[in-house]
Amino acid sequence: MAEENQNPTPEEAAIVEAGAVSQLLTENGFSHESLERDHSGIEIIKVDADLLIPLCTALYAFGFNYLQCQGAYDLGPGKELVSFYHLLKVGDNVTDPEEVRVKVFLPRENPVVPSVYWIWKGADWQERESYDMYGIVYEGHPNLKRILMPEDWIGWPLRKDYVSPDFYELQDAY
């Protein structure tokens, strides 16, 4: 009897099962993509920047009333920047709140995404930090300016292609 090939094709390996939140968004006509769950099983949803506000407004209406964390990261020199939003359904007598993470992948040349400040006020300083460290512009933010670095700082220090000024100067050997 011939042995059957048990290795999945790249297409089969790339299929990600949609979670409950993704299914709810699909049923309500919101365009998005389900990504693989994280190490702790939290559902991750990818959305285009222009659809972030409608999708986040819907998530708020569906009960995701708490922005636990907003942040950003760099996928590497020449690659995209990512702005992410970790949301929870918080309520009375809830010991294990439902969680979802929304990610927006942005081009590093012009990383612009709408601010979610008007949905979750807790995004205020978190979006400012992402702007300060990565240069992601949060359109509609009421006070988008540097929060950690001096106002006259040049560049975005947490980008992987950032070179610190005067860091590589020659040092005297003693």
Swiss-Prot record:
One of its GO terms (biological process) is photosynthesis, light reaction. It catalyses: a plastoquinone + NADH + (n+1) H(+)(in) = a plastoquinol + NAD(+) + n H(+)(out); a plastoquinone + NADPH + (n+1) H(+)(in) = a plastoquinol + NADP(+) + n H(+)(out). Keywords: Membrane, NAD, NADP, Plastoquinone, Quinone, Thylakoid, Translocase, Transport. It is a peripheral membrane protein. It comes from the Bacteria. Its main location: membrane. PROSITE patterns: COMPLEX1_30K. Its EC number is 7.1.1.-. GO terms for cellular component: plasma membrane-derived thylakoid membrane. The keyword Aminoacyl-tRNA synthetase does not apply. It is found in: Cellular thylakoid membrane. It is an enzyme of class 7 (translocase). GO terms for molecular function: NADH dehydrogenase (ubiquinone) activity; quinone binding. InterPro entries: NADH_DH_suC, NADH_quin_OxRdtase_su_C/D-like, NADH_UbQ_OxRdtase_30kDa_su, NADH_UbQ_OxRdtase_CS. NDH-1 shuttles electrons from an unknown electron donor, via FMN and iron-sulfur (Fe-S) centers, to quinones in the respiratory and/or the photosynthetic chain. The immediate electron acceptor for the enzyme in this species is believed to be plastoquinone. Couples the redox reaction to proton translocation, and thus conserves the redox energy in a proton gradient. Cyanobacterial NDH-1 also plays a role in inorganic carbon-concentration. NCBIfam families: PRK12494.1. Belongs to the complex I 30 kDa subunit family. HAMAP family: NDH1_NuoC (MF_01357). NDH-1 can be composed of about 15 different subunits; different subcomplexes with different compositions have been identified which probably have different functions. This is NAD(P)H-quinone oxidoreductase subunit J. It comes from Picosynechococcus sp. (strain ATCC 27264 / PCC 7002 / PR-6). The gene is ndhJ.
